[in-house]
Swiss-Prot record:
<keyword id="KW-0547">Nucleotide-binding</keyword>
<dbReference type="InterPro" id="IPR011529">
    <property type="entry name" value="Glu_5kinase"/>
</dbReference>
<comment type="function">
    <text>Catalyzes the transfer of a phosphate group to glutamate to form L-glutamate 5-phosphate.</text>
</comment>
<dbReference type="Pfam" id="PF00696">
    <property type="entry name" value="AA_kinase"/>
</dbReference>
<dbReference type="Pfam" id="PF01472">
    <property type="entry name" value="PUA"/>
</dbReference>
<dbReference type="GO" id="GO:0004349">
    <property type="term" value="F:glutamate 5-kinase activity"/>
</dbReference>
<dbReference type="InterPro" id="IPR015947">
    <property type="entry name" value="PUA-like_sf"/>
</dbReference>
<protein>
    <recommendedName>
        <fullName>Glutamate 5-kinase</fullName>
        <ecNumber>2.7.2.11</ecNumber>
    </recommendedName>
</protein>
<dbReference type="InterPro" id="IPR002478">
    <property type="entry name" value="PUA"/>
</dbReference>
<dbReference type="GO" id="GO:0005829">
    <property type="term" value="C:cytosol"/>
</dbReference>
<dbReference type="GO" id="GO:0055129">
    <property type="term" value="P:L-proline biosynthetic process"/>
</dbReference>
<feature type="domain" description="PUA">
    <location>
        <begin position="280"/>
        <end position="358"/>
    </location>
</feature>
<keyword id="KW-0641">Proline biosynthesis</keyword>
<dbReference type="InterPro" id="IPR001048">
    <property type="entry name" value="Asp/Glu/Uridylate_kinase"/>
</dbReference>
<keyword id="KW-0418">Kinase</keyword>
<comment type="pathway">
    <text>Amino-acid biosynthesis; L-proline biosynthesis; L-glutamate 5-semialdehyde from L-glutamate: step 1/2.</text>
</comment>
<feature type="binding site">
    <location>
        <begin position="173"/>
        <end position="174"/>
    </location>
    <ligand>
        <name>ATP</name>
    </ligand>
</feature>
């Protein structure tokens, strides 16, 4: 691969469970070594690679010889705890064939929620890459009680792409990409090769995972793509079993579904607001506030709030929703939930008289907000 012909310098590759198991109940080591070969070739060409890998629970089942366990959170975490060591060992052995070392990062939502921990994770990623070591990222399923759920590693890979300032995110799955209908049930379904905008009509095309081993579906890949492209990162969803898929995607061959990055990506802090903290509550906005926030780029004022949901403190990340429940923005609140319950719908000049203090007119300042 000719370095001068490669458009990307830092790539995140996400491998779903269905890709790693090839549809079986165990890791497909032969296919994993083929994927490792492609990533190693990129590294030799000067392209830095970050691997976000699923498969810990599948590896745990295999290592324990498929125990008959009740489908509980504790048992999923048991399998993840056993399987994670087997998974990282497998990758370390496979990459060693090509003279490469790996470093493991197990993350939870808490690592992304806290700004300092978020930046520390970024520094670790950059240090590994600077020393020609492949970072291997997975959700810390053994301790993350609300993280073993649909979409977790798809979204995690997008956040990893933001963390390391990647310019390409490759989501490899058991499908060839995004189709205009479900290809599993509709033989006339056509592959969508290019996406410039992710909207509600596109989200309706997404389906769920059918492997039974993974936690992601096409809808979560759209969520991940939307996060990444807002940060200026291109995204490709493609089949992990297409020959030389990683090499071909990086070479910009027409394969899978390509999502263009937005022209004016979010700056670093707004990337964190979008992808870091979990929303701790929501504010329901009237039509005027929705227009002011989404069309005029203004801060959210108390007058435009008609509902407060959740218990949260000042500085929490919130979702801003319209009266139909559609999320229109995310942002950091300057007032706690209890205070907002008292001043919602009131004019800004009434805040101090109602609360006895005033943190400013803006409930969510436009500089602390990401419009979706």
């Amino acid at each position: 691969m000719n370095l001068s012909e490669i458009a990307y310098r830092r790539v995140v590759v996400k491998l779903g469970t269905s890709v790693l198991t090839s549809g079986s109940k165990q890791l497909d080591k032969a296919h994993m070594v083929e994927l490792a070969r492609q990533m190693a070739a990129l590294m030799r060409s000067g392209v830095e690679v970050v691997l976000c890998t699923s498969g810990a629970i599948a590896a745990g089942r295999e290592h324990l010889q498929y125990p008959a366990l009740p489908d509980t959170m504790a048992n999923k975490q048991l399998l993840a705890a056993v399987g994670q060591s087997q998974l990282i060992l497998a990758w370390a052995q496979l990459f060693s064939i090509y003279g490469l070392h790996v470093g493991q990062l197990l993350l939870t939502r808490a690592d992304l929620h806290d700004r300092e921990r978020y930046l520390n994770a970024r520094d670790t990623l950059n240090a590994l890459l600077a020393n020609n070591i492949i970072p291997i990222i997975n959700e810390n399923d053994a301790v993350a009680t609300n993280e073993i759920k649909v979409g977790d590693n798809d979204n995690l890979s997008a956040r990893a792409a933001l963390l390391c300032d990647a310019d390409l995110l490759i989501l490899l799955t058991d499908q060839k990409g995004l189709f205009d209908a479900d290809p599993r049930t509709n033989p006339n379904a056509k592959l969508i090769s290019q996406v410039e905008k992710i909207d509600d009509s596109l989200r309706l095309l997404a389906g769920g995972s059918v492997s039974g081993l993974g936690t992601g579906g096409m809808s979560t890949k759209l969520e991940a793509a939307d996060i990444a492209r807002r940060a200026g990162i291109e995204v490709v969803i493609a089949s992990g079993h297409h020959p030389d898929v990683i090499k071909k995607v990086v070479a910009k061959e027409s394969i899978g579904t390509h999502f263009s990055a937005i022209e004016n990506p979010l700056e670093s802090r707004k990337q964190w607001i979008l992808a870091g903290p979990a929303a701790q509550g929501s504010l329901v906005l009237d039509a005027g506030a929705v227009k002011a926030v989404t069309e005029k780029g203004r801060s959210l004022l108390s007058k435009g709030i008609i509902g407060v949901k959740g218990e949260f403190e000042r500085g929490a990340t919130l979702q801003l929703v319209d009266q139909n429940g559609k999320i229109i923005a995310r942002g950091i609140t300057r007032y706690c939930g209890e205070a907002l319950g008292l001043i919602a719908g009131k004019h800004s000049d009434e805040i101090e008289s109602v609360l006895g203090y005033d943190y400013g007119d803006a409930i969510v300042h436009r500089n602390d907000m990401v419009v979706l």
